[in-house]
């Protein structure tokens, strides 16, 4: 990088134009006295400055109550007094910021150290109190056995009470510390939100600048933009100068705000370092230091001494190469290169800014290009080239703001994850405190019972001594019958073996009955479904009958109403008929009177009257006949209605009886179905219990399989040792050949030289011939032994391969079928096992044995890994392996020998040669009856496994040159070791609790391995797994996963046959997500993310992404 010197004439212009503007912007109360040609300070910048000052005060108060207002006032006074000079304001501001940062960091350390001292002092006081109580209570102990027991009880109670008080005080201190930490983290989150608001404000100002300059975002690159800018500058030179002045003003304001953001970020980072969290885990410290030294290679000693305060504070608070070092280097480079004004300097600085920055502080620490563009931009604008400089500065600012926003999101994501972990830790702490209190109470109870038992023990001891003295006085002999005891032990052992045999037979029966139970369960579910359908149909039919009854009742009511109406009509007609009868009688009387009058009086008048009466009579008769007919009709209708009502009532009674019978039948059917459903439910619960037991058996089979694999590895090691012995014997044969040739040459030399001494020559010849015969015999014996060993080795290999291919293939198929049948119930058993802490049963011991056997990697490292096997002793599932991989994996699997095949070969050791005896000895380092022995015996014999196998290997290597008798003696002792050998180390309660914790939270072990929070540990694991993949840069759980390539790379490390990573493209997001999710679902990892939403959003929800990545880690790594 070339650096050119700037002209001396540019220095007063910088001091006259750019620096007074910065001073005026740092003092918003004097903004009215701005020089001519410079616009007054915007209210947004003043508000941002006041906000950052308030943030500084807040951080200073949080760090330890240090008053920082004096430093701020000093900063204001230095800025206002240094208006004529150019370098002075920048240096005073940087010094004041460094002082503030050192003050806050030192005050934070003082506060934390004071808190630690207070907590330690309270603990010492509590201990002294408990000691004083004990010392006060001890002298009051009287003599005698009862007094001694009382003293023991009082001591145990006081110790238990002291422990309870200590635990309570510790828990209270931890809760208060957690609350303080949560409050501080909440304050940090509020500050992060204010930073987001300030970044948005800066982006709005950048858009305003682009709008003022006339720069369109669609034409930010290319020759069209430069041509448009040149035409605008050519036509409007005065406007360009004014806009450039505004741009310089805004650049200085942005620079000040960025400096204050740097200071705040540094203080936040010190606070997080003090709290125990680190933001510099994405890059190595040496790489960051090297990268930033390349940005500022020329640093003078004077400037280094100016930034000494910052460097010392960074050494106290963080590692080398951290934010403080980089900030000090940045300020030094800015002070050192203020006198250079070439275009090469501008281009080089902009190219440095465009370099990729991954840390949360890199974007803030990159050297700002706007600082070197004050006065040269004015000169270039007068010369016609200022447009390019402004465009470059705008692009640099855009890039830096984008990087700041990305880092801010990562920081907020990490803070949210930290808050969640703090809440979880607080809950765990409360649970542990309650558990600690409960254990303290139990400890007090146990101490009391221990004191009682010790008193009883002393009492019984005195009684035993008394009885022994009585026996000695009366000369009565007493002997402990060891034979009876050993017989009792043998009887218990035999009963135990019988129980183990019965358990094995029951397990086999359960495995055989499992398919039948599953079929029965399916049939029961189908019957239950049919019964439910029948119940629904019967209910529908009963509803239909009830509706018919209601309609019939309505018809009956209507008929009754009609009958009442007809009865009323008949009654009215009867009344009318009676009235007419009375009228008829009256008329008859009148007629009689008229006849009498006619007989006595005038006949003409009588004729008229008779005529009129006759007419009335006819009318009355017609009316009576019509009324008679109406009455007959109404009576007929009434009779017909009564008949109809009677029929309807008969039908209603019959229908009601039929409905009652049907309802009774339905109730009986419903009761039967309910009883059947209850029976089915009980059968289902029994089947679930049997399924759980079968799952336990499957886990035991897994343990046996792991044991077999470890023994196979030991056999392979033994074969390697035999091959080494074979090579050693071949070397011995070669040395014997060479020695034979040398001796024959010497013999010929002796024969040539000593022909004169015939007797001596004959003696020497006879001796040489005897030696040659001996050597030939030894050579022949060694060759026969070698051929015999090679034949036996080939026979062993062939038998092992032939037997294992059939047995292990059938065994693996049976286990895979069992696992496929029980896969649906695995989730329920895991939830039930993790929901509550069970008592130590066979199931929990088997699970702890299984999980503990995966911890040591020393035994698993003996098996050679293939390129397609992701981890040793772990076969990928059937869905995750391609056909070619299955073919390549079936070879190593076929070499594993089941337990029964190896246990059958434990025969007579005296009839075997040495090497085969060694092979059998190593093969017997496994208990032959392991499938028949429950998990309790396997847990007892676990502890001596590694030690016994290593001692046996050392004995074998030490006895290579020994005689066959010593090897036979070692062979007789090796089965005794093999009875107690096992592939895993002893399972202690602490390891059990850690395994249980890792099953509940799989990220706890990862956090212990990598350090820091669980989120950062998972992020480091993802970075480690995706090392070497192109276009992968994982720095968070949101934007780093938005194209799907990170998921594909992570799953490609485990499932290379499912993901063609070389064919993937970052633009085709939907295809990437589809491939990754399908590959994960093929092995049983359910997708919790939506493909369309992931492909649509640029920043997905980091919590959902982290949950999905945790599921991948849990499946493949735990």
Curated annotation (Swiss-Prot):
Family annotation (InterPro entries): CH_dom (IPR001715), CH_dom_sf (IPR036872), F-actin_Monoox_Mical (IPR050540)
SUPFAM superfamilies: Calponin-homology domain, CH-domain
Keyword Phosphoprotein among UniProt keywords: yes
CDD domains reported for this sequence: CH_CYTS
Coiled coil: 168-281, 395-450, 488-808
Gene Ontology biological-process entries: actin cytoskeleton organization; adherens junction organization; anterior neural tube closure; cell adhesion; cell division; cell migration; face morphogenesis; negative regulation of actin filament depolymerization
GO cellular-component term (any): microtubule organizing center
MF-aspect GO terms: beta-catenin binding
Compositionally biased intervals (Basic and acidic residues): 120-131, 158-171, 947-957
Sorted UniProt keywords: Cell cycle, Cell division, Cell junction, Coiled coil, Cytoplasm, Cytoskeleton, Gap junction, Phosphoprotein
Superkingdom field: Eukaryota
Subcellular location: Cytoplasm, Cytoskeleton; Cytoplasm, Cytoskeleton, Spindle; Cell junction, Gap junction
Compositionally biased residues, Polar residues: 93-117, 133-145, 294-304
Stretches with biased composition (Low complexity): 80-90, 359-373, 972-992
Subunit architecture: May interact with both microtubules and actin cytoskeleton.
Family that this chain belongs to: Belongs to the cytospin-A family.
Name of the protein in question: Cytospin-A
Species whose genome carries this gene: Mus musculus (Mouse)
